[in-house]
UniProtKB/Swiss-Prot annotation:
The keyword Transmembrane helix applies. It comes from Plasmodium falciparum (isolate 3D7). The lineage of its organism: Eukaryota, Sar, Alveolata, Apicomplexa, Aconoidasida. Contributes to transmembrane potassium transport. It is a multi-pass membrane protein. The gene is K2. This is Potassium channel K2. Residues 322-340 dip into the membrane without crossing it. One of its GO terms (biological process) is potassium ion transmembrane transport. The chain crosses the membrane at residues 44-64, 142-162, 183-203, 218-238, 242-262, 281-301, 349-369. It is found in: Membrane. It comes from the Eukaryota. May form oligomers or interact with other proteins. In the Saccharomyces cerevisiae heterologous expression system, localizes to the intracellular membranes of the yeast cells. PANTHER family: CALCIUM-ACTIVATED POTASSIUM CHANNEL ALPHA CHAIN, SLOWPOKE 2, ISOFORM D. Pfam families: BK_channel_a, Ion_trans_2.
Length: 1461
């Protein structure tokens, strides 16, 4: 690591920091020089004491402010350690000191071997922290009032000193020799305090234009050391340099005027806003006149030396005359009795008069606007080229907080332009925060939908916006209408932005999301995200806080807590672990060049070992076949499996084309990089059953021989349809080419015989086209024409193969189409011999190299199709290159969206150039280094010593090649030279290419050596065949069955009779799938045995005909049958008495149930029919017991209970996501019942309990003690003024429920309760004993996120829509290392939990070996599981908390819950 750590920004930071501290040192030395130069007026020791007094006074006030008004980590940490030493508890804290680490321990690991860089890093970190706190102190109200008081004291001292000023004429310089010593001492105290303020300004100096517009800073600059030195040496020549501060004292009057004119108006109950503005105008005019008078008095006043008596009267009369002159000059009266004498005084008069003309009308205008109209704008528009974010729509104040803090946390200091429909006065707190952190903010009250004023967008410079965020209003019902309004705004902006795709829109539902995606803009569906997080948090506790900590930039500090009692100290450990985990964030960065080609597993372990970073997954925009291989789900019965496979095949036939390739692990061991193997598509439900009773996959191979040249023609469906396939072939010397013909337009096969014509091969090598009917008749006689796949594999096992897929030219199609039509018209010509070789020309371009790659396996171990490309100009055959994991994709389509693939352990995935690594880390600096460093060899344990003068880049290529060469066999290494991963693989021009499919590899090598049972179950097909025909053997042979299938007709599912037959058929097949006996179904009426046997025959034939011939009809029938059987089995409402009797009798005959029991059950069902028919209309009860009796079936009463308090309009979406597997009973306790689909209520086991008051009785009566999970939702707010009232009602209910559970229930867990709030600031009222503490003491993070100090947030028991906007701000407009939206979706989908106590199922797990988080991390990684964090129990103060990415030495506990991927 010799380079890559110091960048240009680091060098600029060093230069800037050195210059800042040089200015601080210069001003301090100048202050001491002032003391040394004025020995006659000031004693040195007294002056030093005065300077020390002023510095101590200012620092003490800062300390008081930091202790009681702000939380600074250093001071609070020092004080906390001293308190712990007093109580002898510091030893316990030191034992757990490794738990609470710095947030940048990863960066310290990075630079642990480099001393100077380590020193630089520590200085930079401390400087950034000091800079942040100095900025906060300097812009605080406390410092503002202190500076005003200091300036007033300075002005008073200056007015007192005017009495001692002397000069005889105005051309002379004032003499200050008569000023007493105590005035000099007081001046030194004030100068020393102002020096501390100047130090804070210099340290926190970041934005020059923002600071230069500050009037108080401009005046303070005149009192800095460089300015005073220039004035005292070149402009005003004084014997003592300290006299310059008396000469420039009039500037303090101007500063007081400016502070009063732009004072921060606070809300109070004494004065209104209008009264404050009137007082400010009056005081401003008086201070302006005073500043004018003091300036003119300094320029042209006279106070002679010879006046000994009446000095004070002379001074007072002289100053009043100039005050009178300032009033008549500002009021433009101009009597002329007093006038400016010299040019300097005239310039001053002009400046003050113009200043008055500008300032006074502006103040009166603001006064009139505040009285008669509402304020519609705030701030200034940024017209420069600085980046700014444009927020449009119904932006709430808390949402704006998220955006402001994200800018502060990332250090971007972006400007924000806000076009909102809300009034500006609700953003008062946000305006203070923006001014506090020096963020430029412009707010405009404007609705873009109403006026569609494009000129306004131009006026705010919206066309140059870095990014646009559009918000929706959540206080109105009808999400579709809200989204339509937001989409209208997007269309207006889309037209205005001229095709730019830098907009993000917030939606409330999925209705408009597809349209927004089609435009090319990003969408953020807030309601669906909230529901998914709630559902995930219910099943996996702590999930909400875990995800928020990963995607939010805030950092917590222990110092933000006020521990006033000794009982709070045990919670310090838990809070410290939570705070350390909250610093962990998720990042994505473009892979480094040294990472390209590495296997994911190796990179995963190396990053964790060297830097402590967890590699979670990758983001890529290329198609990858290795990722997310889902295991095949086991089906309970053959019928369900049969239905699903038929449906999948129908979908594949529509989307996919002809050919697929063999599995990747075969090609790794036995294939060449230039070879491929062809896998035939499976033929299901189209094959002909021979008399032996097994399906045979038929292959019809043809050979065309001419002058020792062989061409093999092979069709994907084993037949070549003469009206679709067109081939031309020309002779090539000493070449053998295999042609795989793929149909561009497939024909849907619904009959047993799909085509009429078939191409057969005779011994003489000629192609013969005959009809399918004739071929079927001669099928048994001509068995030689049917070539078995395994036999063919034995013949061609030694041939070499290349993947060449050919599309036939359209001109040849037309030519051959006419010939085919002519052949079909001749009915008597059954044997048409094709002798004309000119009709079969193969356009093979030998000059172009055919590129090919091995194709890895996809989700179900199947290969992808090869798309054929035809060159219409030259009639040449072009082959599309197939990329693999061995090939770097350098040409990537930027239009593709990034997709995230998590946990690629064990999938043998190799990193590409275009990939982005998704990591979980603590330090943003480390991520920046990994993406931009010049060399990363030291991380991967590559020696830095050079050998044979080989550069590091070449060395990395050699290392990468050696890793990839391990996957090839020795035969390949002998035949081909080793090439780099970036080079393309070409086919030799004179290579012999012979046809071969995947069956050859099965016959050549034993399957047991190739596959394992986990990778490929080669016995699966045979087992399914046996399962299909297991219940059909016995009395019937397959030929008769096949003949019967051809004679049957399609069954229409709409007929009632056919439906009854299918009912019997379905139930019989269900019973047969469970037992090995033959099918025996008895009718309800008395029939003879012959009818029963004949009925059995019909059932079997119908069953086979449905599965083989009428699959699409059976699928439609199954859909109807599911709905029918669901209502029959669960509710028995829509069934008639006869149908119920039929089903009961069928079940009784098969299961030997007594008829008496059946009759009793039928009677019970008939009695319940009336009740159930009534409950279909309304599912409203008055108690939990009544709901169990009426609405919850007996089989569902043991399900877990979810209690939802209050009902929203979209509650059914939440229930569908939570109860998708019907394993929960849902009770909604509400006052108003919304309109919902009655079938959804039955399907998802939902019952309403209506009550007006949520008292203790109604809560317990609704099943509170039996509820496994409790979800408390707020009622819908109509406007923004109802938010706090609704939240307080929700908080009261939450605290009441927790009190009841503690009182009534022994096993009470706080993590089973989730409360949703509208305003997250109200979370402080959820804390029983911390409301006043949290309200009085705020940190910098509490200004933005008031919920961070709540134990409810620790345990992930609260959620708010405003909290979810942190995901929206984790965007590329704020940071360079943001993840894509698909990463968030994948985390919500794939993140799981494991209990530590359940890890004993692994035979190699033991707490003796696995004690720390590091041990657990490596143990689960061997199982291809990535560990992210822990969910732990605490104490009464902190019941539960999340510990994200714990320390490596963190000790595990038996009750921990582990978050895994």
């Amino acid at each position: 690591m010799k380079s890559g750590l110091f960048s240009m920004n680091d060098i600029f930071f060093l230069v800037n920091s050195i210059f800042k501290y040089f200015l601080i040192l210069l001003n301090g030395s100048h202050l001491l020089k002032l003391l040394y130069s004025s020995k006659e007026n000031i004693h040195i020791i007294e002056g030093l004491l005065c300077i020390i007094t002023g510095v101590i006074l200012k620092l003490s006030l800062i300390y008081i402010y930091c202790t009681y008004f702000m939380n600074i980590y250093i001071i609070k940490d020092y004080r906390r350690k001293n308190v712990l030493n007093i109580f002898n508890m510091n030893n316990n804290y030191k034992r757990n000191g490794n738990v609470i680490e710095s947030d940048d321990f990863e960066y310290r690991k990075l630079i642990k071997k480099f001393f100077f860089k380590k020193v630089y890093y520590s200085i930079k970190k401390k400087h950034k922290r000091i800079e942040l706190y100095m900025l906060k102190i300097y812009n605080s109200n406390f410092n503002y009032y202190f500076c005003n008081i200091r300036d007033m004291c300075y002005t008073i001292i200056w007015y007192i000193s005017l009495y001692y000023w002397r000069r005889d004429t105005y051309n002379m310089i004032w003499g200050f020799n008569k000023i007493p010593t105590y005035i000099y001492n007081m001046l030194l105290i004030l100068l020393s305090t102002s020096y501390i303020d100047l130090v804070m300004v210099i340290i926190s100096y970041n934005k020059s234009k923002y600071y230069l517009m500050k009037s108080k800073l401009l005046i303070d600059i005149f009192f800095s050391a460089p300015c005073t030195y220039l004035f005292s040496k070149f402009i005003f020549v004084f014997e003592h340099q300290i006299d310059i501060y008396f000469m420039m004292g009039f500037l303090r009057n101007i500063k007081i005027f400016l502070n009063v004119s732009y004072v921060r108006i606070e809300h109070n109950s004494i004065l209104t806003n209008t009264e404050i503005k009137i007082i400010r105008i009056v005081l401003g005019v008086l201070l302006l006149c005073n500043a004018f008078a003091s300036t003119i008095y300094t320029i042209q006043a006279i106070h002679p030396y010879n006046l000994d008596n009446e000095n004070f009267n002379y001074f007072l009369n002289s100053y009043l005359d100039y005050f009178y002159f300032s009033i008549i000059s500002i009021s433009t009266v101009g009597y002329g009795d007093i006038f400016p004498i010299n040019k300097l005084s005239k310039v001053v008069c002009i400046i003050f008069i113009f200043w008055t003309f500008i300032w006074v009308p502006i103040q009166f205008n603001d006064l009139i606007i505040s009285i008669f109209s509402k304020k519609k704008t705030y701030g200034k528009i940024s017209m420069n080229n600085q980046k700014f974010i444009l927020l449009i729509g119904d932006v709430e104040p808390q949402q704006l907080n998220v955006f402001l803090f994200e800018s502060v946390a990332q250090g971007n200091k972006l400007k924000f332009h806000l076009l909102t429909t809300y009034p500006i006065n609700i953003y008062d707190e946000q305006i203070k925060i923006a001014d506090h952190f020096c963020i430029s903010l412009y707010i405009k009250n404007f609705d873009l939908n109403e006026k569609e004023n494009i000129n306004l967008l131009y006026s705010i410079n919206a066309q140059n916006a870095y990014y646009l965020f559009l918000f929706s209003n959540k206080f109105h019902n009808g999400h579709y209408n809200i989204d339509t309004k937001s989409f209208t705004r997007l269309l207006i902006l889309k037209k205005f932005l001229h095709g730019k795709k830098n907009a993000v829109i917030e939606l409330r539902s999925n209705c408009v999301s597809n349209i927004v995606r089609s435009i090319g803009c990003e969408n953020f569906i807030i309601v669906n995200l909230k529901h998914s997080l709630i559902v995930k948090n219910i099943k996996y506790p702590g999930f909400i806080t875990l995800i928020l900590n990963l995607f939010t930039a805030y950092n917590y500090d222990i110092s933000s807590y006020n521990f006033n009692d000794i009982a709070s100290y045990p919670s310090l450990k838990y809070i410290g672990e939570f705070n350390r985990g909250s610093r962990t964030k998720i990042f994505s960065f473009i892979v480094h060049k040294n990472m390209v080609g590495l296997i994911f597993d190796k990179l995963f372990y190396k990053l964790y070992e060297s830097l402590g970073i967890i590699l979670v997954g990758i983001e890529t925009n290329t198609t990858n076949y290795y990722i997310n291989n889902k295991k095949h789900k086991n089906k309970n019965s053959y019928v369900d499996d049969n239905f699903t496979t038929m449906r999948k095949n129908n979908m594949k036939n529509k989307k996919k084309k002809s050919f697929k390739f063999i599995y990747l692990h075969l090609l790794k061991k036995y294939g060449h990089t230039n070879h491929y193997t062809q896998k035939k598509k499976k033929k299901k439900y189209d094959n002909i059953i021979n008399h032996h009773g097994s399906k045979s996959k038929m292959e019809y191979s043809t050979q065309l021989r001419h002058n020792n040249k062989t061409i093999k023609i092979y069709d994907e469906y084993n037949t070549i349809e003469t009206y679709q396939n067109y081939l031309n072939y020309e002779t090539i010397n000493n070449s053998r080419i295999n042609i795989y013909n793929s149909d561009e337009k497939k024909k849907k096969y619904n009959d047993v015989s799909p085509t009429n014509n078939i191409l057969t091969n005779y011994k003489n090598g000629k192609l013969h086209i005959e009809k399918r009917d004739d071929f079927d008749n001669n099928n048994n006689n001509n068995n030689n024409n049917i070539v078995k796949s395994r036999k063919k594999g034995r013949e061609n096992k030694n041939d070499e193969i290349i993947n060449v897929c050919i599309n036939i030219n359209s001109d040849i199609k037309k030519k051959y189409n006419n010939n085919n039509n002519n052949n079909n018209n001749n009915d008597n010509d059954n044997n048409n011999i094709i002798n004309d070789h000119d009709n079969y020309n193969i356009y093979n371009n030998l000059n172009s190299n055919l590129k090919c790659r091995c194709l890895p396996n996809t989700k179900k171990n199947k290969a992808q199709n090869v798309n054929n490309v035809t060159n219409n100009k030259d009639n040449d055959v072009s082959v599309k290159r197939i990329k693999t994991h061995l090939q770097d994709d350098n040409t990537i389509d930027n239009k593709k969206e990034l997709k995230c693939y998590l946990n690629l352990l064990g999938k043998n995935y190799a990193i590409r150039d275009s990939d982005k690594c998704v990591v979980i880390a603590n330090s943003r600096k480390v991520i920046k280094y990994l993406s931009k460093a010049k060399s990363l060899f030291w991380i991967f344990e590559i020696k830095s010593k050079k050998k044979d003068n080989i550069s590091y880049d070449l060395k990395s290529v050699i290392k990468t090649k050696q890793t990839f060469n391990k996957y090839f066999t020795t035969n390949i290494k002998k035949k081909l030279p080793t090439t780099s991963i970036q080079n393309n693989v070409y086919v030799n021009k004179n290579a012999h290419i012979i046809a071969m499919n995947y069956h050859d590899l099965f016959n050549t090598y034993r399957i047991s050596r190739i596959f394992t049972k986990n990778n490929y179950n080669y016995k699966r097909k045979n087992s399914r065949k046996k399962h299909l025909f297991r219940n059909l053997n016995g009395e019937f042979n397959e030929t008769k069955l096949y003949h019967h299938c051809n004679n049957t007709h399609n069954i229409k599912t709409t007929d009632k009779k056919n439906m009854e037959k299918l009912d019997k058929l379905y139930f019989s097949t269900k019973l047969n799938s469970k037992s090995n006996t033959n099918i025996h179904i008895h009718n309800n009426n008395n029939n003879n045995n012959n009818n029963n046997e004949h009925y059995d025959d019909e059932i079997k034939t119908y069953y086979f005909n449905l599965t083989e011939k009428n699959s699409h009809l059976l699928l439609n029938y199954k859909k109807q049958l599911k709905k029918k059987n669901y209502i029959n089995t669960c509710y028995s409402v829509n069934k008639s008495d006869e149908s119920i009797n039929k089903i009961k009798n069928m079940n009784s005959d098969n299961n030997n149930i007594n008829s008496n029991n059946i009759n009793s059950n039928i009677n019970n069902n008939n009695n319940n029919n009336t009740k159930l028919n009534h409950t279909l209309k309304n599912r409203i009860t008055f108690s939990y017991m009544e709901a169990c009796e009426k609405y919850f079936p007996t089989e569902n009463r043991n399900n877990k209970l979810l209690l939802i308090i209050n009902c929203t309009c979209n509650i059914i979406q939440l229930i569908k996501m939570f109860n998708n597997k019907y394993k929960y009973n849902v009770i909604i306790l509400t006052d108003e019942i919304p309109t919902m689909n009655i079938m959804d209520l039955f399907k998802y086991n939902v019952v309403f309990i209506k009550c007006k008051i949520l008292d203790d009785y109604n809560l317990i009566n609704s099943g509170l003690m039996n509820a496994e999970y409790i979800l408390i939702l707020p009622t819908e707010a109509k406007n923004i003024n109802e938010i706090n009232e609704i939240d307080m009602n929700t908080i009261i209910v939450t605290r009441k429920i927790t009190h009841l559970l503690k009182k009534k229930k022994r096993t009470y867990y706080i993590n089973n309760i989730i409360t949703e709030l509208i305003n997250p600031s109200n979370v402080i009222f959820l804390e029983e004993n911390k409301m006043i503490k949290l309200k009085d003491k705020k940190s910098s993070y509490d200004d933005f996120f008031p919920y961070v100090n709540s134990s409810q947030f620790y345990s992930s028991n609260i959620i708010c829509e405003t909290m979810l906007y942190n995901f929206m701000t984790h965007h590329k407009s704020f940071t360079d290392f943001s993840v894509c939206t698909n990463t968030l979706e994948c985390l919500i989908k794939f993140l799981r939990i494991i209990y530590i106590c359940d890890l004993s199922k692994y035979y190699d797990f033991s707490f003796k070996k696995i004690k720390t988080f590091r041990d657990l991390f490596y143990f689960l990684s061997k199982k291809n599981i990535i560990t992210i964090g822990l969910y732990r129990k605490g104490d009464k103060k902190v019941p539960f908390y999340i510990y994200t990415k714990p320390n490596e030495n963190c000790l595990l506990r038996f009750d921990d819950i582990v978050y895994i991927l």
